[in-house]
């Protein structure tokens, strides 16, 4: 590296200072990469500071620089990188806002002052905390049955360490899980042959070197008899609701059927009352006598039985002949 620097500076006198550091930092936090320098006899007038990154396939990129009394930011990184407050007094450390896993890689601090160069190489390792946990219970929580408690972290720097404990949520006191419990191949907790003693809260803890996450799963074991009673009650409620709706439906349709019967009955009576009445009329009878005979005959039929009705009909038919003879005598 010294040979490369000498060839690059040509005839300049170079006092090269190299520093190599590896730093582990946590994602999503604001971090500072250290770089210190000493002002030469010319002071800040000959001071140049440059921060470069070597974290992509495009090679080295300038992130931040100071030259000629001005600070320059890379266009695509504005707002994320800056100098600390005393960069002109010997502290040229780089401030990075909200470190991301993609920021992992090598960073280079290059300071030139009065013909002297100072290099700092920093390798950044970004550590990620475990992600939020997804916890669940699988299986019927009944006496004698088996239940699986699942716990999963989808992100985080490996290795991720899983741990299950029982916890009293009132005072947050943890204690070991029962001896009959087993840890599955995917870090799930297996509870076999459940009993009332398995009731309670179970806590899953996932941790790595930079942080940890926890989640709780509740287990409430029910006896089979209680389950049968609850099922019977549920069925009874369903049947009861069905009977209520069926009774209401039946009463409604019965009322509608009765209403239709009454309407049909009154329609039949109305049709019978309005039907035309047939009668026999002899030729030669006057229209007035016919109307009088019809009115008398109709009145008589409405108040007598069938036998009387027949006799009156016969007498009514004979009356026109007598009246006709009477008119003939008057004419003579």
From Swiss-Prot:
The protein's name: CXADR-like membrane protein
Organism whose genome encodes this protein: Xenopus tropicalis
Cysteines joined through disulfide linkages: 35-109, 151-204
Main location: other
Extracellular domain ranges by topology: 20-231
Compositionally skewed regions (Basic and acidic residues) per UniProt: 320-332
Localization per Swiss-Prot or TrEMBL: Cell junction, Tight junction; Cell membrane
CDD domains membership: IgV_CAR_like
Ranges for domain Ig-like C2-type: 20-123, 130-220
Mode of membrane association: Single-pass type I membrane protein
Transmembrane segments: 232-252
InterPro entries referenced in this protein's UniProt entry, alphabetically: CLMP (IPR042454), Ig-like_dom (IPR007110), Ig-like_dom_sf (IPR036179), Ig-like_fold (IPR013783), Ig_sub (IPR003599), Ig_sub2 (IPR003598), Ig_V-set (IPR013106)
Positions bearing carbohydrate: 193
Region feature Disordered, mapped onto this chain: 276-332
Encoding gene per record: clmp
């Amino acid at each position: 590296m010294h040979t490369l620097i000498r060839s690059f500076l040509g005839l300049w006198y170079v006092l090269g200072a190299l520093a190599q550091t590896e730093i582990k930092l946590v994602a999503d936090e604001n971090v500072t990469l250290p770089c210190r320098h000493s002002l030469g006899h010319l002071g800040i007038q000959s001071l140049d500071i440059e921060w470069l990154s070597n974290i992509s396939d495009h090679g080295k990129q300038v992130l931040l620089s100071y030259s000629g009394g001005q600070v320059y930011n890379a266009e695509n990184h504005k707002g994320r990188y800056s100098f600390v407050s005393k960069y002109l007094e010997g502290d040229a450390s780089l401030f990075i806002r909200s470190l991301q896993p993609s920021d992992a890689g090598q960073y280079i601090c290059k300071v030139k002052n009065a013909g002297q160069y100072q290099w700092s190489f920093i390798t950044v390792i970004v550590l990620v905390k475990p992600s939020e946990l997804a916890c669940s219970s699988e299986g019927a929580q009944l006496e004698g049955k088996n239940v699986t408690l699942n716990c999963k972290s989808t992100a985080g720097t490996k290795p991720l360490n899983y741990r299950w404990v029982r916890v009293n949520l009132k005072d947050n006191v943890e204690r070991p899980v029962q001896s009959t419990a087993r840890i599955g191949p995917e870090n799930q907790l297996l509870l076999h042959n459940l009993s009332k003693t398995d009731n309670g809260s179970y806590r899953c803890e996932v941790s790595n070197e930079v942080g940890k996450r926890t989640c709780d799963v509740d287990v409430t074991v029910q006896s089979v008899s209680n389950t049968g009673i609850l099922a019977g009650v549920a069925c009874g409620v369903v049947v009861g609701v069905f009977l209520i709706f069926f009774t209401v439906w039946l009463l409604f349709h019965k009322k509608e059927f009765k209403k239709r019967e009454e309407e049909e009955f009154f329609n039949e009576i109305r049709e019978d009352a309005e039907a035309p009445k047939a009668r026999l009329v002899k030729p030669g009878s006057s229209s007035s006598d016919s109307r009088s005979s019809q009115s008398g005959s109709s009145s008589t039929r409405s108040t007598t039985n069938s036998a009387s009705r027949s006799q009156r009909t016969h007498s009514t038919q004979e009356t026109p002949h007598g009246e006709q003879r009477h008119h003939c005598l008057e004419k003579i």
